[in-house]
Design a protein with these regions (language model features):
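Class II aminoacyl-tRNA synthetase-like tRNA-binding/catalytic domains
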Residues: 2-7, 12, 16-27, 32-320, ...
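Short amphipathic alpha-helices in soluble, non-transmembrane regions
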Residues: 326-328
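Residue-level detector of well-ordered alpha-helical segments, enriched
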Residues: 105, 324, 447-449
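Short, contiguous, pocket-lining structural segments
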Residues: 217, 266, 317-324, 358, ...
Length: 450
C-alpha cells in the first residue's frame, strides 16, 4: 500500500525534475543566442556594453514625457453593454492634441512586438514606462531591431505622437543599443517565491516594479526624520558599530575578532550606550540613524541586520518624548504624502489606526483591553505561563475578532518569565496593538522608572 502511495509522489518529483532540466536547457539556448547577437554587434564595430549615451540633447525621463502631455489626455470612450474593460481614460491620449515635440529617452526593453513594417517597443526607466513606435520608413536603424531582446537597455530619439488607440508614444527616428542582456527577464509568474524575492531584491524589482515604492518610501522617511530632528536642534552623530561590551538591549549579538588588538568585539545591537555618553559630554540633543545587528530569528518581517533611530534629549521627561514622537510620525506622514502621493493614498486606505493624538495607556491596562477586545479571558498570560492554556480555542476566538497572535512564541516567552512584571511585558509584546505605553515594567528594562 505504501509503495502505491509513493508512486504518484515519485512521478510528480520526476516531472518537476524534468521540467526544471528543460527550463535550464531553454535558458542556456536563449543565453547562447543573445551572446551570438552581441558577437555580431562587435563584428560590426559596435559595443554591446556601451558606457555612454549619444552626445547631444539631454535624456528625458519617461514620466516627464507623459507629464508634458497631460492636457492631451482623452476622455473615456463610452463602452457597449457587456464589453470588456478597455485601457483607463488616464492612459488614453488624443492623437490630434499630442504635439510632435522631439525627445531623447532611454530605458530597459520590456517587450517587442512586430507587425511587418511597424514594431512596438515598450521601455521602462526609473520613473515609468513608455512606448516606442518604430516604423520602417522613419527609423534609420529599423533592421537593427532584430538584435534587440527583452531586458536590453536602449536609447532612442524621435518625436511624440499618439497611436490610433490613444497610446502615447515616441516615433523613433534613431535607436542605439546601450547594454545587451544575456539572461531573460524574470516574470511575476516565474518569480513569486516570497523567500527568493527577499533574498534577491534586485530581481524582484524587475519582476515587480511596484516594490520600488518601498525603497522610495524608506528614503523619504529617513530624510523626513532628519529634517524633523535637525529643525529642533538635535545633532546627528555616528557612534561605534563594534563594541567591547554587549549593551543597550537584551538581544543576542554577533561576535567578531579584532586581529591587531587580539580583542573580542560585538556588533552593536543598539546605539544607546554611546549616545548617552555624548549627552554626559554636553550634547543635550543627539540622535543617530544606526545600522544594528541582532543574532536572532529571521523572517520576511524580522531581519538580523536593520536600521533604527534613537534620540536623546536632556531636561525632558518621557511625556515630552511621547509628544515629540507623535509629532515626528505626523511630520514623516506629511512628507510621504508630498513626495509619494499615489503610494501614500494607498497606504492610508489600508490603515487601521490614526495619527492623531495617541492613546497613552498603562501597560497592564493595555493588555486587559486587548484581551477583552479579542474575546479572550483576562488570565491568558498567567495560564499560558502555567501551561494551562487552550491555545486552539483562544486562537479561534482571536481570529474571529480580527486578531492574529503568535501563540507559539508567546507561550515560549511566557515560560521564561521569572517575575509578574516580566510576564506582563511578555504579554504586552504579543497581545497589544501599538500605542504609547505608561507604567513600563521595571523588570523588563533598565530605562523604566520604579
Amino acid at each position: 500500500m505504501s509503495q502505491q502511495k509513493d508512486r504518484p509522489n515519485d512521478r510528480k518529483a520526476e516531472r518537476l525534475v524534468k521540467e526544471a532540466a528543460e527550463a535550464a536547457r531553454a535558458e542556456e539556448t536563449l543565453i547562447a543566442t543573445r551572446k551570438a547577437k552581441a558577437a555580431r554587434l562587435r563584428d560590426r564595430g559596435e559595443n554591446p556594453f556601451a558606457n555612454d549615451v549619444t552626445a547631444g540633447e539631454p535624456l528625458t525621463e519617461l514620466a516627464a514625457v507623459r507629464a508634458r502631455f497631460d492636457g492631451a489626455r482623452a476622455a473615456a470612450e463610452p463602452k457597449a453593454e457587456g464589453a470588456a474593460p478597455d485601457r483607463p481614460a488616464a492612459d488614453r491620449y488624443d492623437p490630434a492634441s499630442v504635439e510632435p515635440l522631439p525627445f531623447r529617452v532611454a530605458g530597459r526593453v520590456l517587450f517587442v512586438r512586430s507587425f511587418g513594417g511597424v514594431t512596438f517597443v515598450r521601455l521602462r526607466d526609473r520613473t515609468g514606462e513608455l512606448q516606442l513606435y518604430c516604423e520602417q520608413g522613419s527609423l534609420a536603424e529599423f533592421e537593427r531591431l532584430e538584435d534587440i531582446d527583452l531586458g536590453d537597455f536602449i536609447e532612442a530619439r524621435g518625436v511624440a505622437m499618439a497611436t490610433q488607440k490613444g497610446e502615447l508614444s515616441i516615433r523613433a527616428e534613431r535607436l542605439r543599443l546601450l547594454t545587451k542582456a544575456y539572461r531573460p527577464l524574470p516574470t511575476k509568474t516565474s518569480f513569486k517565491d516570497v523567500e527568493s524575492r527577499y533574498r534577491m531584491r534586485y530581481v524582484d524589482l524587475v519582476a515587480n516594479p511596484h516594490v520600488a515604492g518601498v525603497f522610495r518610501a524608506r528614503s523619504a522617511i529617513v530624510a523626513a526624520l532628519r529634517e524633523f530632528l535637525d529643525a529642533r536642534g538635535f545633532l546627528e552623530v555616528e557612534t561605534p558599530t563594534m563594541h567591547t561590551l554587549v549593551g543597550g538591549a537584551t538581544a543576542k549579538p554577533f561576535k567578531t575578532h579584532h586581529n591587531a588588538l587580539d580583542l573580542e568585539l560585538f556588533l552593536r545591537i543598539a546605539p544607546e550606550l554611546f549616545l548617552k555618553r555624548l549627552v554626559v559630554g554636553g550634547f543635550e540633543r543627539v540622535y543617530e540613524i544606526a545600522r544594528c545587528y541582532r543574532n536572532e530569528g529571521l523572517s520576511t518581517r524580522h531581519n538580523p541586520e536593520f536600521t533604527m533611530i534613537e534620540y536623546y534629549q536632556a531636561y525632558a521627561t518621557y511625556e515630552t518624548l511621547m509628544d515629540g514622537t507623535e509629532a515626528m510620525l505626523r511630520h514623516v506622514d506629511a512628507r510621504l504624502a508630498e513626495r509619494l502621493p499615489a503610494e501614500h493614498a494607498a497606504w492610508v486606505a489600508q490603515r487601521t489606526y490614526s495619527l492623531e493624538r495617541f492613546a497613552r495607556v498603562p501597560m497592564a491596562e493595555g493588555i486587559a483591553r486587548a484581551l477583552s477586545k479579542s474575546g479572550l479571558p483576562a488570565d491568558v498570560p498567567q495560564r499560558i505561563a502555567a501551561d494551562d492554556a487552550p491555545i486552539k480555542e483562544w486562537a479561534k476566538a482571536a481570529k474571529a475578532s480580527g486578531r492574529e497572535i503568535d501563540w507559539t512564541n508567546f507561550r515560549a516567552g511566557a515560560k521564561k518569565c521569572e517575575s509578574p512584571g516580566e510576564l506582563v511585558f511578555s504579554a504586552y509584546e504579543y497581545v497589544v496593538e501599538p500605542f504609547l505605553t505608561r507604567d513600563y515594567r521595571t523588570e523588563a528594562g533598565d530605562k523604566s522608572i520604579p
